[in-house]
Amino acid sequence: MEQVNELKEKGNKALSAGNIDDALQCYSEAIKLDPQNHVLYSNRSAAYAKKGDYQKAYEDGCKTVDLKPDWGKGYSRKAAALEFLNRFEEAKRTYEEGLKHEANNLQLKEGLQNMEARLAERKFMNPFNLPNLYQKLENDPRTRTLLSDPTYRELIEQLQNKPSDLGTKLQDPRVMTTLSVLLGVDLGSMDEEEEAATPPPPPPPKKEAKPEPMEEDLPENKKQALKEKELGNDAYKKKDFDKALKHYDKAKELDPTNMTYITNQAAVHFEKGDYNKCRELCEKAIEVGRENREDYRQIAKAYARIGNSYFKEERYKDAIHFYNKSLAEHRTPDVLKKCQQAEKILKEQERLAYINPDLALEEKNKGNECFQKGDYPQAMKHYTEAIKRNPRDAKLYSNRAACYTKLLEFQLALKDCEECIQLEPTFIKGYTRKAAALEAMKDYTKAMDVYQKALDLDSSCKEAADGYQRCMMAQYNRHDSPEDVKRRAMADPEVQQIMSDPAMRLILEQMQKDPQALSEHLKNPVIAQKIQKLMDVGLIAIR
């Protein structure tokens, strides 16, 4: 359990640092050692979600709930993955199921509220999510003055994020006025018309509904600025960047409160490859946007463009910093994907930059000294550092495998031996150490197979020959109790998988009742292989 906790903590630190693949590896190794630990599946679900692999996040969320049905966090993980997969109805049901077990769980309550809001948005269009929302409000004199009030902007953002709150906000006259502007109808007169039930009001003449404010309602400077912007856009599309810059600059002079004209200038410099100027203009645009309470989506775009400029220069650490700033303002799939791409490249760069065979040799020698003294934990640390410094050296994995075997961490020893053999298939030590780990686990059949592979490479290898003889004698003389056999067998992940297969359990029951059925089942090579595995580990015997 100490090894499991250590791997879990390493995974948590890696996830916090943004090293998602490292976190996944740690959690997966811990799960192999403790497959019934619900917390490990929950943590791995979070890591998969952060990576963008929502299907695997969902599968781990389901496993968490199966292992610990009364734990609210499991339902949160499962529901969050369903949300990312756009399976909103299922996510809602999952939150509801979780609340049956933990009625006061705040995370589940908020998740359910958000899910209900998103489902409501699907059924009814949310006018507060219009792409040109602030432009419409600024164009209409009824709402233009309201935009200078910070509480009004907070109200708008609240209704954008939680449209289900609209029903509770209708008492606010500002909300009714805003709806009138956004929907293009005069909601203020509706109550009066409903009260005059008889006689009913005559049907309104066609096209008498209040028209949406047109460009004519804008001040002259803003109208001219928009025209300059359109001219700039046309020039930009034709890649006439100098002309585009002149028009955007003129638009900015006419309407200095609109950050869009500055970000358009930044886009031109981005295309020209002048990334310093692009970043300078984006920073200026953000400053103008903050001062004039611009929509957070526009702020996010400016930060994303700064991130893109650093990405182009292969300055991935800076790019990640600004992508995260953009995501904090407004989360979009494109920016998230770009950020993850930059993180992956940066991680690989750091890994490659860390490689140094000379330092790896120093760490290996330190590890050898500690191993000779019997200080196996310290030796393992030195070998691990050596592997980071030179991950293509097969002997380092072999040395660390020897440490793991001394520390009775046989599964980890086997993993290192596999890596060693893969890197250098003719290296005898990789095979003998793998066989030694299997022998220590009392898996004599597998151990003999591996010792034989070593002898195939070098028939004079005394270590392999002696090991083969030991395993043969141990297999012949073994008198394990049924409990020992079962406990040892069930520690093997392959056996666990076979025994958890409902079809195999049915076949084994049938073999007990009708031994003649065995010959039929052995005709299927897949089933025959599984039965042979169970025989090898001593779980079943055929007489």
Swiss-Prot record:
Major location category of this protein: cytoplasm
Cellular localisation: Cytoplasm; Nucleus; Dynein axonemal particle
Location of region: Disordered: 191-233
TPR repeat boundaries on the chain: 4-37, 39-71, 73-105, 225-258, 260-292, 300-333, 360-393, 395-427, 428-461
GO biological process: cellular response to interleukin-7
Residues recorded with modification N-acetylmethionine: 1
Bipartite nuclear localization signal (motif): residue ranges: 222-239
Compositionally biased tracts (Basic and acidic residues): 205-233
Residue(s) of cross-link: Glycyl lysine isopeptide (Lys-Gly) (interchain with G-Cter in SUMO2): 123, 210
Modified residue annotations for Phosphotyrosine: 354
Phosphothreonine modifications at: 198, 332
Residue numbers bearing the N6-acetyllysine modification: 8, 301, 312, 325, 344, 446
Alphabetically ordered keywords of this record: Acetylation, Cytoplasm, Isopeptide bond, Nucleus, Phosphoprotein, Repeat, TPR repeat, Ubl conjugation
Gene3D superfamilies documented for this protein: 1.10.260.100, Tetratricopeptide repeat domain (1.25.40.10)
Sites of Phosphoserine modification: 16, 481
Glycyl lysine isopeptide (Lys-Gly) (interchain with G-Cter in SUMO1) crosslink, residue number(s): 123, 210
Signal peptide (residue range): none
Gene Ontology MF terms in the entry: Hsp70 protein binding; Hsp90 protein binding; protein-folding chaperone binding
PANTHER family recorded: STRESS-INDUCED-PHOSPHOPROTEIN 1, TPR REPEAT CONTAINING PROTEIN
Domain notes: The TPR 1 repeat interacts with the C-terminal of HSC70. The TPR 4, 5 and 6 repeats (also called TPR2A domain) and TPR 7, 8 and 9 repeats (also called TPR2B domain) interact with HSP90.
Physiological role: Acts as a co-chaperone for HSP90AA1. Mediates the association of the molecular chaperones HSPA8/HSC70 and HSP90.
Protein name: Stress-induced-phosphoprotein 1
Taxonomic lineage of the native organism: Eukaryota, Metazoa, Chordata, Craniata, Vertebrata
